[in-house]
Amino acid sequence: MRARCLHPGCASKFSLQVGGGNDHMTRHAKTHARADGEAAAIQSRINFNPDGTSRGIFVYDSARQREALATLIAVNDLPLGFGESPGFVEYIRTAHTPSFTQVSRQTTSRDMKKLAKAGRVAMKEQLVSSIFSVSITSDIWSGRAKQDYITVVAHYVSSSWELNKRIIGFELIDVSHNGVNIANAILKVVTEFGLTDKIFAVTLDNASSNTTAMNTLIPIFEVYASKFLLHQRCACHIINLIAKSALDDLDPHINKLRLAISWLNASNTRLGDYRNYCAVINVPCHGLHLDMPVRWNSTYLMLQLVLRDQVQFSAFVNANFIQNDGEPLLVEATWHVAETIFKFLATFYESTVTLSGVYYPTSHLIVHYILEIAQHLKEYENDATLLVAVYNMKQKYLKYWQNIPLLYAIAFILDPRAKMEGFSGVLSLLSFTINVSYDQYSLDVKDKLQDVYSKYELKYGPAVAHRPPAVPASGRGKKKVWGKIFGTSTATPSSSTQTPVLQGGGELAKYLNSAVLATNDDDDDDFDILQWWQEKRSTYPVLSILARDVLSVPVSTVSSESAFSLAGRIIDDRRTSLTPDMVKTLMSVKDGELARRRAQHTTENPELIAAFEAMRWTEDQDET
C-alpha cells in the first residue's frame, strides 16, 4: 500500500506497511507546516512605499501576480514565456515569495487577452458616456514579417479636463492601401467604439490616398461638428516636406564633415586612437554618426554632435587625414557653414518637437510656428550658403501654409491671450513677411467661427439655464512674442473699449469683445489653456465645450507613428511569429498601462535619437 501527500502542489508518495510506523509521513507534514508558516509571514506583512510611508498589509494574491506579470511582459516587450524562465522564477521565490508558481506562455497569453478585453471595455464606456468628442489620427506601418498594420489613435479631453491619447485600433491591413480601404479600416474601428457621431477631426499625413479616404469619411463624421474642420493635415509632415526640400542644396556644404566622420568610423584602430586622444586632452569622447540621406532631422542631430566636439575632432582629423593637396580637411570655413546650417535647421526641429506633444494642446500653437517659420525663411533668404535652399523651402511653405487651415485659426482665437485682436496681428505680420493679403481671410475666419459656434449653441445651448456675464481678463505685460503680435513695444494689448469685434450678446461676442488675457514673463510658457477654459465654464458654458473640442485636435500624426515604435519593439526579430491578434493584444495592454502612468508622451523620434546617443563612448565630464 502507498499513501499520497494531500498538500497543494506536492506529489510525494509514501509506503505503508501493516504494523509499521508513520514517523516519515509526520516529518514530511511538519516540513510543509514550517514552509507554510514562513510563506505566510512573507505573504502577509506591512508594505512600505519608497519614502517610508505604509501601504498597509500586503497579502500575496496569485491572480494579481499573474495580472502584474502580464502587464510587465507587455510594457517591457519581454517574451510571453518569461514567467516560466528559470532565472525569473528563482528570483521571485528567493526575493519575494517562495510559493510562487511559474506561469506558462499559454497562461500568460490568456491573461493578456483578458487584460486587453477588460481595458477596451472600460475605454469604450468612458468614451461613450463621459466624452463630448474625439479627434483621431491614423497611419499605416509595415512590419518585419511583411504584414502591414493601420493604427487609429483617439485624442480627447476627459471630464477632468486632461488631454488623453489612446490607441483604439491596431489592425492588420492585408489589402491595397488605397483611400477606400483606409476609410473602411478607420470606420471599422470608430464604429466598434461607438464614436461615429463623436468625431470632431481626423489628422492624417499628406498622402493622396488619405485625401480619398476623407472624401468617404467626411459625410459620415460631419454629424458632430462641421465639415470644414474634419480633415486636418499633419503639420509635422508639412514641416518635414519644407525642410527636406533643402537637403539637395545643403549636402555639398557638409560633405567634408561626412567624409571625416566616415573616415573615422571606417577603422577600429582610428576609433581607438581618437578615444586615446580625447583621454589625453581630458575631454569627453563621443561617437559620431553619419546622417541618413532622406532625413533632414538626422542631419540636424549629426551636426549637433559634431559641433559639440568641434575642437578635438577637427584637430584629430587634420592631424591624421592627409588630402592629396596637403591641405587640412576641416578648416574654419567648414565649421562656419556647418554652424549656419545647424542654426537654420534648429527652428524646424524644435517646432516639430513641440507640435508632437500628446498631453498638452497643440492646435492653438501651430499659428505661432507658421508665422515663426515664415519669418525664419525671410531672415535667411539672402544668406549666400542657403540662398537656393531657402527659395525652394519658401515655395513648399506657400503651397501648404499660404492658406492657414481654419481649425488652426479658430484654435488660436480661442487662446484668451490672443483672441481676434492677436489673430489680426499675426495676419498683419504674415502678410508683410510673405507678401500675401489676408483681409478677406480674416473675415472668412470670423464667419466660420460664428457658424460653428451657432451649431454648438443649438446643440448645447438649451441645456444652459443661466449664463453669467463674461469677466474681462486682467493683468499686465506679455512676452516679447505677444508684443510682436500686438505690434507694441510694451507687449500690452489695446484697450477693451475699442470697437466691438462681434456684435450681439452671446457668449462668443462677450469672449471676443473682452480684453485679452495678459500673462507675465514668468508664467506665460506654463499657461494651461485647458485649465483656463475649465475655470470659465460657468462664464462660457457653450463656448467652453467648443474650446475643449478644438483644443483636443492634434496637429501631428506623431502619436500614430509612435504606436509603430511600440509595434517595432513588440514584433522584433525574436517575435515575428506572433499572430496579428496577439500583436493587437500586446499593443492594447502596453498602451493602457503607459496611459495610466501618463508615459506615452513622445515628442522626439526615439529611434533616431538613440542611433546618435548610443554612439557615446564616455560619460560627459563637467567643464572646469
Predicted segments, located by residue:
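Active-site neighborhood segments
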Residues: 58, 76, 80-279, 286, ...
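Mobile genetic element proteins and their domesticated derivatives, centered on retroelements
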Residues: 5, 25, 88, 104, ...
